[in-house]
Amino acid sequence: MVENMLANGVNADFVRTVEGVPTGIAIVTVGENDNTIIVVAGANAEVDRAYVDSVKEELLTYDMVVLQHEIPLDTVHYIVDLCFENQIPVVLNPAPAAEVPADIIEKVTWLTPNEHEAVLIFGEGKTTEELLLAYPEKLLITQGSRGVSTALRSGQVLNVPVRPAKVADTSGAGDTLNGAFCYRIAMGDSVEEALRYANTAASLSTEKFGAQGGMPTAAEVEKALKEAAG
């Protein structure tokens, strides 16, 4: 895993080996172009407050921090609080699905659940549009084949449809979308520009098998965007 990260230009300086604990794994079963994922946390469960404190000096130099629920929720919330106190933007992808406290929702810059995760977090009392309008340019909801939606501060609900794709495997599509969205936001794109880029990247990822192996390069995404624009 680390070798693959390094081969793709990802800094792995702070990836640590935990003695006697296996690497976390996700077993993905694919059928009818969809997937079921079984997660064994392994060493991911060892990412605690002490580890965060040990890398705090480095963490506070970052332009953006991206989190998921793949590590203990206590650690996630600890990092959110730390970043909020130091005015560092945080993107929280609440997967695997779990409740998100109201104060954490307020402190993150972006919250990016899928439809099912959004129901768990906010309940079933409001429509997707009502939820988005309650959290403009904070809440981003992915909706599978129906694309991704958010609300702008102007009050407009922005729906970005999916790019047509020959779907082979949806594993990692959400991770791809989140990564691409954060990349483009960090590069200065508008919300709409970043979402169109991210949705295209996610669509391309579904045309290959594997969560990591299916992720497209920036060049592939740019090519697809140019082709779509004619």
Model-derived regions, located:
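Conserved N-terminal subdomain of the carbohydrate kinase-like
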Residues: 1-63, 221-230
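Structural motif corresponding to alpha-helix initiation and N-cap regions
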Residues: 24, 49-55, 73, 97-99, ...
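Conserved phosphate-binding/catalytic region of the ribokinase-like
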Residues: 99-103, 126-230
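Conserved beta-alpha-beta core of the PfkB/ribokinase-like small-molecule kinase fold
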Residues: 64-130, 146-147
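A residue-level structural signature of the nucleotidyltransferase/glycosyltransferase Rossmann-like core
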Residues: 44, 110, 138-140
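Short, hinge-like loop/turn segments at secondary-structure boundaries
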Residues: 4-8, 31-34, 85, 107-111, ...
